[in-house]
Amino acid sequence: MALGFAGCALPRDPGLGSKFRDDFERTGLGKNYFDTIGRYRIINGKLNIEKAYNNPLWLRRRLPRNVEIELDVMSRSKDGDMKIELFGDGESFARDRGAYVASGYVICMGGWHNTKSFIARRLEHGREGIDMVSRTDVKVVPNKVYHWRILRQGKELRWYVDGELFLSYHDEEPLYGRGHDHFGFNNWESDVWYDNLRIEALSD
């Protein structure tokens, strides 16, 4: 099993403030992101990645404890596998192509060759109902744009897809604080596109 790996410690990132938005209407990633593999790129106003092998693109902003995240996601691959990480450490990445131990929660739609969607607390291959919750009844349709909305309030993490509750996860010891305060885009092999990222702090 490959542990998430952190290289040299990065300077402390600024807080989110009340909100953060990114429509990717530019040519380069810019200073707001840390690319752990050097393969993330912006094409025609959208963020694109494939073959990242669990090397995230981290947003250089610290998340508040309670937060709402919205974004549009599309896969051009039949394998689906659209993925983000939240409340991670902002710098870790997989050292090899073995099982990945994330530093935060992993949210994935159409993972494992489009057979499973899940919320996982660090362990993508963890115990159902303990480390993760999942469903197998939904397949990602290639080239279809999905709108994701994720809410973390207290011990509850809720994930909505196109306005409908998709999965929820209850965590008695929610990840938060230093080492668990960043958002990241992630990927295995699929050709995935992201757009219209919005992150907003919620009241306690």
Pin down the residues of each PLM region.
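Extracellular carbohydrate-recognition regions
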Residues: L10-T36
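Extracellular glycan-recognition surfaces and repeat-rich motifs
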Residues: T27-Y53
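Flexible glycan-contacting loops in extracellular carbohydrate-active proteins
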Residues: Y169-D195
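Short tryptophan-centered beta-strand motifs in secreted/extracellular beta-sheet-rich domains
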Residues: F24, I69-L71, K144-Q153, L157-W159
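Beta-strand-rich interaction surfaces with strong enrichment in secreted/lumenal proteins
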Residues: N55-R61, S134-V140, F183-G184
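Short, aromatic/His-centered strand-loop micro-motif at the edge of beta-sheets
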Residues: E124-H147
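Secretory/extracellular carbohydrate-interaction modules
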Residues: K51-R122
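C-terminal motif of bacterial Sec signal peptides marking the signal peptidase cleavage site
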Residues: A6-G7
